Amino acid sequence: MLKSNKVVLIGAGGVGSSFAYALTIDNSLVHELVIIDVNEDKAKGEVMDLNHGQMFLKKNINVLFGTYKDCVNADIVVITAGLNQKPGETRLDLVGKNSKIFKDIITNVVSSGFDGIFVIASNPVDIMTYVTMKYSKFPIHKVIGTGTILDTSRLRYFLSDRFNVNTQNIHSYVMGEHGDSSFVTWDETKIAMKPLSEYLSEGKITELELDEIHKKVVNAAYEVIKLKGATYYAIGLGIKNIVNAIIGDQNIILPISSYINGQYGGLIKDIYIGAPAIVCKEGVKEVLNFKISPKELEKFNNSANQLKSYIDKIEF
């Protein structure tokens, strides 16, 4: 149950600051945003900068610098803290470093008395979401990761550009790891209400083009990192979307890091991985278990096994 429409952000780096900015300019629900960072001056500077723009907002939001004690009455704690992916690194390369950072963060948040919902955006996000669940001992529906929400947004952008159709009218998901082993649910994809299979049969797109689009989705982060050093605007918007879904009790379907324990064929168990789920004020209302093709199911299992191999190395 929501208490105060209060959000605490832990991590004032590029992703956290982009989320905070997105939340302030498109805010109709959150009353208070508290920013915490190990670099206190950075957090204080972000708070000042955001507050100095209050005159230009349709609805003001109380932005404050804080400490872990401020988590006690928060509805949501968003975590973007941790080491960033560097050029040439995969997200999975960050497991050991960020899992240690998370142990300290989660311990401090839980010690405050926080009993709301965690939203995790730090990479590798599926594993960090699992780590959060284990360290916090929170119910699985109250621990959410950004999952493949950004991958899905990238996919819909590329399809929108290819077909000249608004992204809102493209229904397709990226599932699996937020990373190199992800896959697209092509068999379930619809563009402007029309199944993708019809576009293929009509010769309006080819399987080869679809493969190239997926490669662009997978490589997008590497390209952005190479060009500007980090990705943060798009994922900041994605986090804002998840937070609004919770605060606004939207019951919206989002491709988040969902807890899978036997869905999708029964082979994937005890893992957080990108899959569509219904998000509401309680967190995850339901992880969807829709039918995917045998080929897609094999990719899903492979992606889960890859994540599992890294999780098994973490000492809880």
Curated annotation (Swiss-Prot):
Pathway: Fermentation; pyruvate fermentation to lactate; (S)-lactate from pyruvate: step 1/1. Keywords: Allosteric enzyme, Cytoplasm, NAD, Oxidoreductase, Phosphoprotein. The modification Phosphotyrosine is found at Y222. Allosterically activated by fructose 1,6-bisphosphate (FBP). NAD(+) binds at V15, D37, K42, Y68, G82, L83, A121, S122, N123, T146. It catalyses: (S)-lactate + NAD(+) = pyruvate + NADH + H(+). Beta-D-fructose 1,6-bisphosphate binds at R156, H171. It comes from the Bacteria. NCBIfam families: L-LDH-NAD, PRK00066.1. GO terms for cellular component: cytoplasm. The gene is ldh. This is L-lactate dehydrogenase. GO terms for biological process: glycolytic process; lactate metabolic process.
